Design a protein with these regions (language model features):
Chain A
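Solvent-exposed, non-transmembrane regions of membrane-associated and secreted proteins
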Residues: 32, 38-39, 49-270
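Terminal targeting segments of Actinobacterial cell-envelope proteins
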Residues: 1-37
Length: 270, 56
């Protein structure tokens, strides 16, 4: 079969055939080249398939995995959460005083749950202490340990992936000023209102300051800062979303009415 | 290469097909468990933190 296909360079190979004729069919230079190029070709096709599989894994499977882990984290938090699941009073009817500020848990432990109705009626993501890959790649939103806790005067800053591993902040650019962002901790519910966003270079750590981007200024407000990659599917910049604390109610008062259904669902599932 | 592997697998045809499927599945598991998570650090899609705060 191989003999018939070889038409070029037959004079060279016929001269060699005379010298190398042995008990087995002689291995000609063109055979070796064909073998090598076949193996090379198969390896290249394999590499191509592996790369495509990687893209599928990165853009799809990591989300499936992270979603499962985050749902589990939300459920276990909801199970431990004590307090009514229905609002005790209409929103803002009672003033519960200054918000209770919890102490930061250890690395990898759960602070609470974030609800963002703008991101979807079922958007419930865990907030975990720490912002390295071990937290962000599986559990969603990571709290910058150097920043305040929810409700404190100052800056409560969290990071989340724009793409892959749950893509918790994929829709960060869709927030509209006035949108509510709810943070639930063991102490209660903190309602933040989205104020503005900012696109900065990745080294702008000043967005995490107590008063974002203003060094040495004493904070008067409670800010929630969310950071994620920008643009989508890129990382040349960071998109920062700032929200200010609008209200607080203790766990015993029940959830704000807008997220009551989600809070009940999170606990009901557990 | 793959043809050579297939020819050199032991057993009748159906056993060889089964062995191939097991080998492909094993390769997939190894990739998802070890290769892809390792390779993922070279992509930049997951850089969502500011500055060097994420360094352990």
């Amino acid at each position: 079969m191989a003999h018939q296909q070889t038409t070029t360079g037959s004079s060279v190979s016929s001269a060699r055939r005379g010298q190398e004729r042995g008990p087995r069919r002689p291995l000609r230079a063109s055979d070796v080249i064909r073998k090598i190029s076949q193996i090379l070709g198969e390896l290249l096709i394999t590499a191509g398939i592996v790369l495509l599989l990687f893209v599928g894994w990165e853009l799809w499977w990591t989300n499936v995995e992270a979603d499962a882990k985050q749902t589990e984290a939300v459920q276990s938090f909801a199970q431990d959460f004590t307090g009514p699941m229905t609002p005790a009073a209409p929103d803002a009817a009672v003033d519960y005083g200054p918000p209770v500020v919890g102490t930061a848990p250890g690395y990898g432990e759960m602070i609470g749950i974030m609800y963002v109705p703008r991101f979807g009626a079922d958007y419930t993501r865990p907030i975990i202490e720490g912002t390295d890959a071990g937290v962000l790649d599986t559990l969603g939103l990571g709290h910058y340990g150097t920043t305040s806790m929810p409700g404190a005067v100052g800056n409560f800053a969290v990071a989340g992936h724009r793409q892959t591993h749950g893509a918790v902040l994929d829709n960060i650019h869709t927030l509209v000023p006035g949108d509510k962002i709810y943070v639930q901790t063991a102490d209660g519910y903190y309602t933040y209102v989205f104020r503005n966003n900012q696109i900065v270079l990745p080294d702008r750590t000043d967005v995490l300051m107590p008063v974002p981007t203003q060094a040495g200024v004493t904070p008067k407000e409670s800010i929630l800062t969310m950071t994620s990659c920008n643009p989508r599917f890129g990382s040349q910049e960071r998109i920062i979303a700032y929200s200010t604390l609008d209200g607080w109610q203790p766990a015993s008062a029940g959830p704000p009415s807008e997220i009551a259904a989600q809070v009940a669902q999170a606990q009901g599932k557990g | 290469m793959y043809a050579w592997i297939f020819r050199n697998l032991p057993g009748p045809l159906w056993v060889r097909i089964l062995t191939c499927l097991v080998l492909v599945a094993a390769a997939l598991v190894l990739m998802v468990q070890f290769l892809f998570p390792w390779f993922s650090q070279f992509t930049t899609l997951t850089d969502s933190t500011i500055g060097l705060v994420q360094q352990p």
